[in-house]
Design a protein with these regions (language model features):
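Charge-dense, helix-prone N-terminal extensions
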Residues: 1-111
């Protein structure tokens, strides 16, 4: 019986290595997130930030192994920022979804 359990334990370890996610690359994530945000209706890219109707809405910077992102609570000349430190692909996708939802809300309120 011990031999069967050893085989199962070894297989589980090799499966974990096979299915492990690649390490997070903030530079690559920045490129993908910028591409996704360019597709959001109402956002305009300027240098390392995105604007909504000429007002700052999103800023993105790389900080070591993380992507630092700031999202304006409301668009303004000097907005109140919501800061996030993105350290994996899931957090980057969630941030992109949050930006889309917030910009959609701003667009609807502006109409």
């Amino acid at each position: 019986m011990a031999r069967v359990n050893d085989d199962i334990d070894n297989r589980d370890a090799s499966d974990a290595e096979f299915f492990s996610a690649p390490p997070f690359n903030p530079a690559e994530a920045l490129v993908q997130l910028r591409r996704a945000l360019r597709a959001v209706t109402g956002l305009t890219e300027r240098a390392h930030r995105f604007e909504w109707k000429g007002r700052q809405a999103v800023t993105l910077t790389i900080d070591g192994e993380r992507l630092q992102a700031r999202l304006a609570r409301r668009p303004a000349a000097s907005p109140e920022w919501e800061s996030r430190s993105l350290k994996n692909g899931a957090e980057v996708r969630k941030f992109g979804d949050d930006v889309r939802q917030r910009v959609s809300r701003w667009n609807n309120a502006d109409e």
